[in-house]
Regions:
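Walker B catalytic motif
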Residues: 88-93, 98
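Conserved D-loop-proximal element of ABC-family nucleotide-binding domains
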Residues: 83, 96-99, 103
């Protein structure tokens, strides 16, 4: 019985973290939420139950990203979990999103990666994308985090490297002076 109660408590804690993250991304407490009723997960959109098959691919990806960050904190105190060393790999975080959700996701990533990268100076993060706008947003985000890390830890700036995959080879990305319009042509 104690084990079952502990599992249910873990479910409530995880859902609390996921729902807090969903609220952060959607800028609303009711836009999208997950509830646990009668041993089942229920998706709520604007307070009304919705079938998983009826939500968009973007919403599914958002749930996956929120679950990813919540699962890292599983069975840990949130206050100390960020002080551990991590390697965070995030693959194309804003695919399938409209502009409003892209803004929410990038803001959420800045918030979460800030907690991890500033929580332990040895934590590393890799973001992969095929979208140049996401790349430029990520570059700005990492620039801000590098400055915050320099203030917090002092000394040399953290290393920030940019690469692109070209002809199956990973090469340094020539980011200076590169324009998205030129790339699209």
């Amino acid at each position: 019985m104690d084990e079952l109660e502990a599992k249910q408590k873990n479910v409530r804690v995880a859902l609390s973290i996921i729902n807090r993250n969903l609220s952060y991304i959607f800028f609303s407490n009711d836009r999208f939420k997950i509830d646990y009723r009668n041993n089942n997960y229920v998706l709520l959109s604007n307070g009304k139950p919705v079938q998983p098959s009826k939500i968009s691919q973007g919403e599914r990806n958002i749930i996956g990203l929120c679950y990813f960050f919540a699962s890292i904190l599983e069975n840990q105190e949130e206050t100390t979990a960020y002080t551990k060393e991590y390697l965070l790999l995030i693959d194309d975080p804003v695919s399938s999103f409209d502009m409003e959700n892209k803004t929410g996701i990038m803001s959420f990533l800045r918030y979460q990666l800030g907690k991890f990268l500033l929580g332990n100076e040895y934590t590393k993060s890799i973001i992969m994308t095929h979208d140049l706008l996401t790349y430029y947003d990520s570059e700005k985000m990492f620039g801000e985090l590098i400055e915050a890390s320099k203030v917090k830890y002092g000394g040399d700036k953290p290393v920030y490297k940019r690469y692109e995959l070209k002809n199956k080879i990973l090469i340094p990305f020539p980011h200076n002076g590169r324009q998205e319009y030129t790339e699209l042509m």
